[in-house]
Amino acid sequence: MGGQVRVAIVGAGGRMGRTLIESAYHQEHIRLGAAIERPGSSLVGVDAGELVGVGKLNVIIMDSLDYATDDFDVLIDFTAPEASIVHLDWCVRHKKAMVIGTTGFNHAQKEQINAFAEQTPVVMAPNMSVGVNLMWKLLELAAEVMGDYTDIEIIEGHHRYKKDAPSGTALKMGEVIAKTLGRDLEKCAVYGREGITGERDRETIGFATVRAGDLVGEHTAMFADIGERLEITHKASSRMTFANGAMRAAHWLVEQKPGLYDMQQVLGLN
């Protein structure tokens, strides 16, 4: 799309919401059309630009999408699973596209998203960063070459406030590796180890989780053999990388037909 894409951001007052507002401000092809907070928030009525320190944008934080129906083309949501489902339902009814960066969806919620995406364009990805999406491609190659004879472990770390574990990015890493190797992640995943576990089963994929301080996001996949190991690591030092990826997804999504897309498609990696 040649012109500016208007975006709305829900959860505007949160850590990620504020970063998204700042990212939208700096994007040439994006314009912030609306910013939404929960009813009762002390931020309702505040100018979104002044909230994040970029100056007045004349976009006042509101407490309902219903007040912003004509102000945006794509909704960007990094909130919580239950809220994201409600917002997607709203987007379907009002013919709006949606970018979902929320993680922690259960199986039933994912099925709801699949059904809604038949009626409106949706990009959903556990991680919007370019580097992470490239990492998933590298994991495919590593799994093809080394996966059958190495022990595979995935280690991830995030800030103390993150609510779901393992992270959506770590689970996607496991899914990519398992699919490449013809395994079912639900059957081969091992989440943490404690006590007398016995010898390691080569077919398993292990997960370890760290929650500490202000870690933005660190992910490592280890392919370990006797005598050598390969580690593929991505470290995020700022949430801005995720926000910029979400803006890129929004700009791409506005011209797509209804369907469920991911960042691999946005970036042309598929």
From Swiss-Prot:
Annotated EC: 1.17.1.8
A cellular component term, taken from the record's GO annotations: cytosol
Catalytic residues of the enzyme: H158 (proton donor/acceptor), K162 (proton donor)
One BP term from GO: diaminopimelate biosynthetic process
Catalytic activity from the UniProt record: (S)-2,3,4,5-tetrahydrodipicolinate + NAD(+) + H2O = (2S,4S)-4-hydroxy-2,3,4,5-tetrahydrodipicolinate + NADH + H(+); (S)-2,3,4,5-tetrahydrodipicolinate + NADP(+) + H2O = (2S,4S)-4-hydroxy-2,3,4,5-tetrahydrodipicolinate + NADPH + H(+)
A GO term, aspect molecular function: NAD binding
InterPro entries attached to this UniProt entry: DapB_C, DapB_N, DapB_N_CS, DHDPR_bac, NAD(P)-bd_dom_sf
Any single Pfam family the record assigns to this protein: DapB_C
Top-level taxonomic group: Bacteria
CDD domains: DHDPR_N
Amino-acid positions noted as binding NADP(+) in the UniProt annotation, renumbered to this chain: R38
Keyword Oxidoreductase: yes
Pathway: Amino-acid biosynthesis; L-lysine biosynthesis via DAP pathway; (S)-tetrahydrodipicolinate from L-aspartate: step 4/4
Keyword terms, alphabetized: Amino-acid biosynthesis, Cytoplasm, Diaminopimelate biosynthesis, Lysine biosynthesis, NAD, NADP, Oxidoreductase
Chief location category: cytoplasm
Subcellular location field: Cytoplasm
Enzyme class per UniProt: oxidoreductase
PANTHER family: 4-HYDROXY-TETRAHYDRODIPICOLINATE REDUCTASE 1, CHLOROPLASTIC-RELATED (PTHR20836:SF0), DIHYDRODIPICOLINATE REDUCTASE (PTHR20836)
Entry's family note: Belongs to the DapB family.
Official protein name in the record: 4-hydroxy-tetrahydrodipicolinate reductase
Species this protein is from: Shewanella sp. (strain ANA-3)
